[in-house]
Amino acid sequence: MGTRREFVAWLSGLSLAGLARPLGADQAVEDKAGAAAQAWLDLVDGGRYGAGWDAAAPAFKSMVTRDEWDQAVHSVREPLGRCLSRTLRSHKLVDALPGGPRGPYVVLQFETDFEQKAGVVETVTPAFGSDDVWRVAGYFIR
């Protein structure tokens, strides 16, 4: 498939491809999705990549094995060092992503400063599951 960085980008489900149809603003939904994204990012920030995979949405898990995820995200995140700060820059509630099942999803874009690189853009896309739980379905870092 190419480099591991491309693989992690692919995992994002093309969430920012501009093909997602907006549903409109629903702050309570976005807040719940944002809390799920933050809890998941806490796992990844702590180097608990396998636990991040365990906590991810089924669609995420169907695209990559736990070991593949661990290797791919390790190769992208470790060189950046520890997360120093993360600021939410945008959020968008959508009902579909290219190639994915119907949503809803919330596409969250953060500006993140790491020890070795500032101004990194992270996109985290939680999906609302059939069990009424928000779980991360996509992660893209550039």
List the predicted regions and their residue ranges.
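Short, low-complexity N-terminal intrinsically disordered segments enriched in polar/charged residues
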Residues: 2-3, 9-14, 19-48
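Generic hydrophobic alpha-helical segments
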Residues: 14-15, 59, 76, 133
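Structural motif
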Residues: 44, 78, 129-131
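Exposed beta-sheet edge and beta->alpha loop/turn motif
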Residues: 91-142
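Short solvent-exposed beta->alpha transition segments
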Residues: 34-36, 50-103
